[in-house]
Amino acid sequence: MSEQNNTEMNFQLLRIYTKDISFEAPNAPHVFQKDWQPEVKLDLDTASSQLADDVYEVVLRVTVTASLGEETAFLCEVQQAGIFNISGIEGTQMAHCLGAYCPNSLFPYARECITNLVSRGTFPQLNLAPVNFDALFMNYLQQQAAEGAPNHQDA
């Protein structure tokens, strides 16, 4: 019985870095003269890849678009990445770790980066709310289960 439990879970954050960054204010400077009542859209995406045995890169892409009516006030995109050493887990647990736990670790860094970029663009402060990556991952699993077998034919 003890031989089955020899594989101990190991999770270690090796590095956090900004992989890509972009800030655009296509309608500046006249956008600064308008009443600031923006519609803010937040898009999130994650990707992961295995770099070596038990070593993974996870990239969290955060895109924020602020619009005033039909005009884009600013578009900000950050790809915050991390290198993680993960062992002792497999299957759904590994997918959850790469798709929820790691992005949870990266989001505060991406949020800070976006806040700084928006501020340097001289726009009013933008405070992004925390994101529940566990809930997003569960929704993703439910969508995959609902779509089920028909999508496997496309592969």
Curated annotation (Swiss-Prot):
Record text on subunit structure and interactions: Homotetramer, a dimer of dimers. One homotetramer interacts with 1 SecA dimer.
GO molecular function, one term: unfolded protein binding
SUPFAM superfamilies: SecB-like
Family: Belongs to the SecB family.
Chief subcellular location: cytoplasm
GO biological process: protein folding; protein tetramerization; protein transport
Name listed for the protein in its UniProt record: Protein-export protein SecB
Intrachain disulfide bonds: none
One GO CC annotation: cytoplasm
Gene: secB
UniProt xrefs under HAMAP family: SecB
Localization, UniProt: Cytoplasm
Lineage of the organism: Bacteria, Pseudomonadati, Pseudomonadota, Gammaproteobacteria, Enterobacterales
Role according to the record: One of the proteins required for the normal export of preproteins out of the cell cytoplasm. It is a molecular chaperone that binds to a subset of precursor proteins, maintaining them in a translocation-competent state. It also specifically binds to its receptor SecA.
